[in-house]
Amino acid sequence: MAEIKNYTLNFGPQHPAAHGVLRLILELDGEVIQRADPHIGLLHRATEKLAESKTYIQSLPYMDRLDYVSMMCNEHAYCLAIEKLLGVDVPVRAQYIRVMFSEITRILNHLLWIGAHGLDCGAMNILIYAFREREDLFDMYEAVSGARMHAAYFRPGGVYRDLPDTMPQYRVSKIRNAKALAKMNENRQGSLLDFIEDFCRRFPKNVDDYETLLTDNRIWKQRTVGIGVVTPERALNLGFTGPMLRGSGIAWDLRKTQPYDVYDRVDFDIPVGAGGDCYDRYLVRVEELRQSNRIIQQCAAWLRANPGPVITDNHKVAAPGRVDMKSNMEELIHHFKLFTEGFHVPEGEAYAAVEHPKGEFGIYLVSDGANKPYRLKIRAPGFAHLAAMDEMSRGHMIADAVAVIGTMDIVFGEIDR
């Protein structure tokens, strides 16, 4: 009798659990995965090459569109690399605002991850819970930058503007009566800081709700415990960073090991897993939600007590104020030069990395002294994680491949660049 050979299956790029445009070629023995070959490049937009023909400030909005779930964290790394080459000092208030919004971004990312990962594994309702909180976080983005996602709020030398004193309010519409509207606008009567502090008070209970839905859920544990196990040694050898590395038991976090901005002034813990499976990585990210909430509360308290400038006063790097620009010739010249030519960065090279929600997001910048980068290299955390897809899914069932993709938290904007 003829021997039945393994057969090959295309998974994605249209599959809803492919998290974008992942194409996996799976070699199967029945329903057991023998080999997984990820194909990337379907979302390649040549960001690194485009940056070579744009001034430093013009490339900033491209950063939002790399990992389009963790927008401000991408901007953060880019600005840190430029500041390293320029030798610019960032005002402390701007550093606190950056750290606060980086943590808001971390919560945004992890909420989408927990919703999508749960949905991939059959937990249908967690997505609705997660998106309820994401709405408030997008409102914070909107209040500070005018955009709900691609904020372009960070600047080399600080941030675009200070925190606003008012919050956008829901307006009268045909589908909401006055009573419902008043309840929705209840926590929007004060400043952005008031709104953030109100969110931080409510959020721990919301995280408890997510844990009630998943943590001790028998089906969730069956789908994640013992799936995609990575030992600490293999995690290091594979280049894992972020929750993927901490889930395997290694307490490595750039916010602690190589602190940037004011991370050395805020108090938080690094959650670490023990088993290195999908369930451990889930627990690590859930605890990160709580720790990010702690950091945001500390930043909000400091910002309330310490007014000050939010961008460097070096007008060769940051534009002068509108009032000065319209009344003073020197400021007008600075403004004109910045918006036509941009600033020139001294010759040299710099690498800046941030603890992105997905891992170590790095920007390697080479300058030849011009107003545009000579070379910009992006170190995407998801790239190293996806490379381990074959090792993590081998020997598991085809349904577990979805859980492994989910636990990696991959977004193709940053992997394909």
From Swiss-Prot:
Class of enzymatic activity (EC top level): translocase
Subunit structure: NDH-1 is composed of 14 different subunits. Subunits NuoB, C, D, E, F, and G constitute the peripheral sector of the complex.
Identification of the protein by name: NADH-quinone oxidoreductase subunit D
Subcellular location: Cell inner membrane
E.C. number(s) listed in UniProt: 7.1.1.-
Main location: membrane
Family that this chain belongs to: Belongs to the complex I 49 kDa subunit family.
Tagged with keyword NADP: no
NCBIfam families per the UniProt record, alphabetical: NuoD, PRK06075.1
Catalytic activity, reaction form: a quinone + NADH + 5 H(+)(in) = a quinol + NAD(+) + 4 H(+)(out)
Task performed by this protein: NDH-1 shuttles electrons from NADH, via FMN and iron-sulfur (Fe-S) centers, to quinones in the respiratory chain. The immediate electron acceptor for the enzyme in this species is believed to be ubiquinone. Couples the redox reaction to proton translocation (for every two electrons transferred, four hydrogen ions are translocated across the cytoplasmic membrane), and thus conserves the redox energy in a proton gradient.
GO molecular function, one term: quinone binding
Keywords of this entry: Cell inner membrane, Cell membrane, Membrane, NAD, Quinone, Translocase, Transport, Ubiquinone
A GO CC term assigned to this protein in UniProt: plasma membrane
Membrane topology of this protein: Peripheral membrane protein
